[in-house]
Regions:
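Short loop/turn segments that connect beta-strands within beta-propeller blades
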Residues: 79-83, 127-131, 194-198, 260-264, ...
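Short coil/turn segments that connect the beta-strands within blades of beta-propeller domains
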Residues: 62-63, 110-111, 167-168, 231-233, ...
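Blade-level signature of beta-propeller repeat domains, shared across WD40, Kelch, NHL, RCC1
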Residues: 367-408
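A short loop-to-beta-strand structural motif that recurs across blades of beta-propeller domains
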Residues: 74-76, 121-124, 179, 186-192, ...
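Beta-rich, blade/repeat-based domains predominating
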Residues: 44-60, 93-108, 141-165, 215-230, ...
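Conserved beta-strand positions in repeat-built beta-propeller and related beta-rich domains
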Residues: 67-71, 115-119, 155, 172-176, ...
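Beta-propeller fold detector
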Residues: 24-40, 85-91, 132-147, 200-215, ...
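A short helix->beta-strand "capping" segment at the edge of beta-propeller domains
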Residues: 22-50, 354-359
Length: 408
């Protein structure tokens, strides 16, 4: 596919404007979280009240939370008050490889939970009580050239991002970097499994037709965050590491792209960037867009390097505002940030020499590399937003109504 925009500028969601009416609202000092998970937080680690580089979160309709705890190789179920209810590891799944590396998590319309297990090339399906139901997909080790061959239908190398439609169809990103990279240009594999019934049992079948029609792996280069529109017609993906060749994107601005859920074809819609002369010239996101979530008429997106959550109008694409600030006591593994004699980089956090969760104030929305996100209306009618505050080793919880009243 040619990435030249031709005449689709009129379809673009231009989100940067000098208009006073469209100036985004910063909610960082206006709205604060009402709580965190774990509620008795103890920072980075493997304890019951600890998380170690959590990646994603999914809010269940009863107000409980599922968290993928990556460095601990476990899936955690927390109650609505932030207490640990259950933990699932390789042993519980009867897998010999302890490094299951759980990453993405999603739910379907019937409340089943789906978790991508990057380390073992599978998707695990659970009941709403986190009781194991079945695996979806099978592990494999194949080349990019052979990935879509018939004999490799449904196999997975390193599944990460996942989203599930209400009808149970599963969409997963196979982020095997060194398999799909060509000439230093990144790409990934993409699979859809559709739900079916065989002998009165729920089964998942690989959708070869979707694989043949989808344009996702042509338009995108590195993605993990995905979400589906309320009408179950549009699939949204976040671009983490774009190339200059994508839409004349010389500044490599990050964006969110829209695709048809049934066919995977590109819908000529981008969020988070502005266009001039058929090229992307500016963008909202600092350096990385991670988790995304749709709620009613809003699209929420995590700006990882900016330490905040960005809000868009789903229909117009307008950039409405954001919440969060980059945590002072944190820098990534490639940096050093020595403060009062302590280096708050990721290596020191893992080693226990730095404890940013004690320094960064969650009540002030100070986020250290936020990642996954989830938004939902609970069974009791309350509306909740959850954000993974990765290197502060916690999940931030917001009253979604307090956020949205600023945009309604």
């Amino acid at each position: 596919m040619d990435f030249k925009l031709f005449s689709i500028a009129s379809f673009f969601f231009v989100t940067i404007s000098c208009s006073e009416k469209q100036t985004p609202t910063d909610l960082t000092t206006l709205v604060q979280p009402f709580g965190i998970i774990p509620s008795s937080q103890n920072g980075y680690g493997g304890g019951l009240d600890q998380l170690a580089q959590p990646d994603d979160v999914e809010i269940l309709s009863d107000g409980s939370f599922v968290v993928t705890d990556v460095d601990n190789n476990r899936i955690q179920l927390f109650s609505s008050d932030g207490s640990l209810l259950k933990s699932v590891s390789a042993k519980n799944l009867q897998l010999p490889n302890q490094n299951i590396i759980p990453t993405g998590v999603a739910t379907d319309g019937d409340g089943f939970i789906y978790v991508s297990l990057e380390g073992v090339g599978r998707i695990a399906r659970f009941t709403s009580e986190l009781i194991f139901d079945q695996f979806i997909g099978r592990p494999c080790s194949v080349s990019a050239e052979n990935y879509y061959r018939t004999e490799n239908d449904g196999c997975l190398i390193s599944p990460q991002g996942i989203i599930v439609a209400k009808n149970g169809d599963v969409y997963v990103i196979d982020m095997a970097k060194y398999v799909f990279m060509k000439n230093e240009v990144r790409n990934f594999g993409f699979r859809k499994f559709y739900q079916s019934t065989k002998s009165n049992k729920t089964v998942y079948l690989y959708d070869r037709g979707f694989a043949q029609s989808q344009e996702i792996t042509t338009i995108m280069r590195k993605s993990e965050g995905m979400t589906i529109s309320p009408d179950q017609k549009t699939l949204y993906l976040a671009e983490e590491k774009p190339e200059k060749s994508q839409f004349g994107n010389l500044k490599k601005m990050r964006y969110i792209a829209a695709f048809d859920l049934e066919t995977g074809r590109f819908l000529n819609r981008l969020f988070g960037v502005s266009v001039k002369n058929d090229s992307i010239v500016e963008g909202v996101f600092k350096k990385a867009v991670e988790g995304i979530s749709v709620f009613e008429k809003y699209l929420f997106a995590v700006d990882e390097k900016g330490g905040k959550v960005v809000v868009f109008d789903l229909r117009s694409g307008s950039h409405l505002g954001s919440i969060g600030r980059l945590a002072y006591y944190y820098c990534n593994k490639e940096s050093d940030c020595v403060i009062d004699g302590v280096n708050y980089n990721e290596q020191n956090i893992i080693a226990g020499r730095a404890m940013p969760h004690l320094k960064n104030d969650w009540r002030k929305n100070e986020m250290a590399s936020p990642d996954g996100i989830s938004a939902i209306t609970l069974d009791d009618g309350s509306r909740i937003l959850a954000v993974v505050d990765q290197w502060n080793s916690r999940i931030l919880l917001y009253d979604l109504s307090k956020i949205l009243r600023n945009f309604d």
